[in-house]
Amino acid sequence: MIAALESCHRVEFYSAVDFNAEYAESAREIVSKKFNNIIARAAVLDFSNKKEISTINLSEDHSNLIICLGGTIFCAGNEDYIDKVVENIANLLKAGEYFIFGADISDSEQALRPAYFTDLSYQLMLNAMHGLKQALGDSNSNFDPTAFEPVFRWNERSTTVELLLRATRSQNIIIDNTECCIIKDVLYNILNSRKTSINEIKLRLSKYKLEIVNIYETKDVFGNKFALLKTKKI
């Protein structure tokens, strides 16, 4: 973001928007310290919430640009969520204004596996199981959240990376006074990451009068493909 702002001309206002207040404030502070000529502010916002979006007042006197970094919109597994976010962002823009965002367009299992099937992803999944044990309380003190091994699966039909845990032994847990069984060797889906083709993105954007004008593609060390898309409201 700093590099992008340094290459821009006549930028007067910058809003750091995030669902997490701490992240938004950190971004605002970085920009404020780096650029004396830019007025920066932090805003906590859920772009899928139409009511929250309606509170944003973009400049009527200047051209506006919305940049979405971090987690990519089109990786969400929920189609309704993607539509809500894209529609709400499109409604903020006037004709001729721009929206720039990143997209993970990888479609090779061979490249995706080493990028996603890591010790870090395994630890994240185990953290979810530790969180489950904590949420369930004292009645499940014997539940072992580490009795799982990681499994990677590429769902070609839905173009989704699925990270799962396979139970290494059977266990019983109690949820709302109901005994449930975790069965040995059964797979439990924990994390998903959707991959979307450029054509699918283009079709979805067109519903909200957003047109792709530039695509910048790159690859990581594993061969996974990423794209930065510049779109214009028409």
Can you describe what each PLM-predicted range is?
Residues 91-108:
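Conserved beta-strand signature within the Rossmann-like core of class I S-adenosyl-L-methionine
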Residues 222-234:
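Core SAM-dependent methyltransferase catalytic element
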Residues 105, 112-211:
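Substrate-binding/catalytic lobe of Class I Rossmann-like enzymes that use SAM or dcSAM, i.e.
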Residues 2-50:
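Class I SAM-dependent methyltransferase SAM/SAH-binding core
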Residues 60-71:
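Short SAM/SAH-binding signature in class I
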Residues 50-61:
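Short amphipathic alpha-helix with an adjacent loop that forms part of the alpha/beta core around
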Residues 17, 69, 100-103:
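Alpha/beta-hydrolase-fold catalytic nucleophile elbow
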